[in-house]
Amino acid sequence: MGRLIFVSFGLLVVFLSLSGTAADCLSGWSSYEGHCYKPFNELKNWADAENFCTQQHAGGHLVSFQSSEEADFVVKLAFETFGHSIFWMGLSNVWNQCNWQWSNAAMLRYKAWAEESYCVYFKSTNNKWRSRSCRMMANFVCEFQV
């Protein structure tokens, strides 16, 4: 009886320690601060990339950065996965011509502009944002909250 309680307690500890970690992410996705991320080496325009992300998981969108630490994590992940490339993120003015917003409707709090235009991408070699026509093709990073 004591052994059963000990084993049950041990399993409970393991389960609780995995909560909110990569165990909550799909296979091939990486976890950071309660979110799962995956860079995709597929060239898509911004709208097609956003649509693809929404189909990957409930609540999925192109990545949105809420802090420099989160951005550093994703930039490093993208570089380690594919090397030098550019990646769409969820920031655009597609829906409101003058108001930038993340594709998941989060407020824009953290900024790292290099220049302005339509849809925003980042280079996997640094954390500098650039904009370009949303019709251009780029790789992308999807994100969902666990």
From Swiss-Prot:
Keywords: Blood coagulation cascade inhibiting toxin, Calcium, Disulfide bond, Hemostasis impairing toxin, Metal-binding, Secreted, Signal, Toxin. One of its GO terms (molecular function) is metal ion binding. Expressed by the venom gland. InterPro entries: C-type_lectin-like (IPR001304), C-type_lectin-like/link_sf (IPR016186), C-type_lectin/snaclec_domain (IPR050111), C-type_lectin_CS (IPR018378), CTDL_fold (IPR016187). Residues 32-143 form the C-type lectin domain. SUPFAM superfamilies: C-type lectin-like (SSF56436). It holds the Pfam family Lectin_C. One of its GO terms (cellular component) is extracellular region. Disulfide bonds join 25-36, 53-142, 119-134. Belongs to the snaclec family. Calcium is required for ligand binding. This is Snaclec coagulation factor IX/factor X-binding protein subunit B2. It comes from Trimeresurus stejnegeri.
